[in-house]
Amino acid sequence: CIWNGFTMNGREDDYTWSDPYIDNKQVVVVRSDSGIDDFSGLKGKHVEVQTDSSALAALEGDQKDLAATFADLNQVAEYNTAFMDLESGACDAIAMDIGVANYQVNSRKNPDDYKILDKEISSEQYAVGFKKGNTELKDKVQKTLDEMAEDGTVDKIAEKYADYGVPGALCIGKNSK
């Protein structure tokens, strides 16, 4: 199975899926002193995004009109580079997953130097993907996940990552059949 922030949306027919466990969204991070408070503030700005990310897919797809307002949309190999660019002023904003954004902002020396814009670029759900037709393994994993959600184990684990927004993003147990 594949299980590491694996987006199910758009791939529903490619795999056998568990129920979703995270409601994820793509957001924009800016410096707090940038004067950028919403998407309109991104007009004419230099925005970075990770190559092959959901944020890039959204900005090249459903949100291409938003991306067209940017001075440019630069792809980077990983978000550490993007944050160094944001810190140095080489870019004005970063489009990224909310969990990674929360992690990156909260791990900075001065987290208050950054803010995540309120509006999301797009949203998606994470689930565990299995080889198409492998319902036996999917059912075993799903049963365990459901038990963990029911007995509070999932919430206890998620609470360890509260600084990254994990508890609020959980949907496991809410969509169970």
Model regions and ranges:
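Short helix-initiation/N-cap motifs at beta->coil->alpha
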Residues: 34, 72-88, 124
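Acidic, polar ligand-binding/catalytic clefts
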Residues: 1-41, 120
